[in-house]
């Protein structure tokens, strides 16, 4: 069961958040509709464990405590504030850098402050688990990301465009945008100069306007694809420019 939540960035709300100590990243995930459905489910059924996927759903912890006796486990996919701190560090002086500082500092306060509110934490890497243990006595284990290999058959090169480069990812996530922006401005001109026949394909949900309307030689902006695995098998080499990140880059594992 799913409840649709509007996660679009609203400029007015984002601006007003500058005068708040709350994390705008987290505030975007708060939904009255989702809260009502969650409470209904908790009242209708009993659970031993409620697993919260990422810190962005932690605002619902009080509702879970009130309507359930279940233990609450946080599944931590990343150390979220470190991603935004690194983006801030890679940004030149100016209004954008000041805004990014507000984002990562408010997110840090929330992320570290919420750790003691849960009964257990499942980090996605050992490194993340060690970091989190520095800030809480709550039990922490590291459980890596896994895939069902039967869903990823042995690749063949029958329908693969050789040579070709590609990137796939959610393009409404700023670290992905910043990585691609760097690759197109710093790396791609050199690649194209030496391999003028090579094409670079960009795929992913919520492709931003600057990519859809931009032009770079031999760069093909596809946008959302129906089958990510089929798309990856149709191209040769995956490009994953990382300027800021934490946890595990799932798409790299899937591409392997």
Residue ranges and their predicted role:
Residues 38-58, 71-73:
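Short N-terminal targeting/anchoring amphipathic segment
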Residues 41-43, 114, 230-234:
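Structural alpha-helical scaffold elements that stabilize or flank donor/cofactor-binding regions
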Residues 71, 81, 100-154:
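Donor nucleotide-sugar binding/catalytic pocket of nucleotide-sugar-dependent glycosyltransferases
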Residues 119, 233-247:
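Acidic donor-binding loop of glycosyltransferase active sites
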Residues 134, 142-234:
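Conserved catalytic-core segment of nucleotide-activated headgroup transferases in glycan assembly
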Residues 229, 250-256:
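Short alpha-helical segment that forms part of, or immediately flanks, the ligand-binding pocket
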């Amino acid at each position: 069961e799913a409840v649709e939540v509007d996660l679009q960035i609203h400029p007015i709300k984002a601006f007003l958040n500058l005068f708040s100590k709350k994390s705008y990243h987290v505030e975007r995930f708060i939904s009255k509709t989702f809260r009502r459905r969650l409470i209904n489910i908790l009242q209708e059924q009993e659970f031993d464990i409620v697993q919260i996927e990422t810190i962005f759903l932690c605002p619902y912890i009080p509702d879970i405590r009130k309507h359930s006796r279940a233990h609450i486990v946080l599944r931590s996919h990343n150390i979220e504030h470190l991603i935004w701190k690194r983006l801030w560090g890679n940004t030149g002086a100016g209004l954008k850098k000041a805004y990014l500082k507000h984002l990562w500092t408010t997110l840090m306060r929330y992320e570290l402050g919420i750790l003691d509110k849960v009964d257990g934490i499942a980090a996605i890497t050992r490194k993340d688990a060690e970091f989190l243990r520095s800030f809480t006595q709550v039990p922490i284990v590291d459980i890596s990301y896994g895939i069902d290999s039967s869903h990823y058959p042995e690749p063949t090169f029958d329908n693969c465009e050789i040579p070709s480069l590609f990137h796939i990812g959610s393009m409404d996530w700023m670290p992905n945008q910043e990585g691609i922006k760097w690759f197109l401005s710093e790396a791609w001109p050199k690649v194209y100069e030496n391999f003028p026949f090579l094409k670079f394909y960009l795929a992913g949900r919520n492709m931003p306007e600057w990519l859809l309307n931009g032009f770079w030689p031999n760069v093909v902006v596809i946008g959302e694809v129906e089958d990510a695995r089929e798309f990856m098998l149709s191209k040769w080499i995956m490009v994953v420019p990382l300027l800021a990140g934490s946890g595990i880059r799932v798409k790299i594992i899937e591409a392997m």
